[in-house]
Amino acid sequence: DNSGTDQMEKAYWKEAGVAPKGTWFVSAGLGMGEVLTMAGEMRAYTLSDRATFGAYRAKTGLEILVQGDAKMFNPYGIIAVSPKKYPDINHGGAMKLIDWITSKEGQDLIASFRVNGEQLFFPGTGK
């Protein structure tokens, strides 16, 4: 599907020198939730983003086997578009949102967000 997770999976296969083909490999072509459900039913392995896995963990019986690889770091960012290029936008409001998201209060809220007790997002502004 060319998502970030799909691209990461392809990079891992390439780095390992393994062609993901054959009867042992299933290319589902589904959304992450559906893939997790399928992996749970098949008792198979899959690569997943943490947020979707957290939401599906109890439904599938799957457990995390590997985590923490720096290559899996998937940062989110926030930017305001140019008010010169898009004069009808609420640039002031966008800047207030950016200031709040990157503030200690915003970063603390991001860090406190949990699904089933597990932290999904890790602040990275350094403020």
Model features per residue range: what roles?
Residues D1-K127:
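Exported/periplasmic ABC-transporter solute-binding proteins
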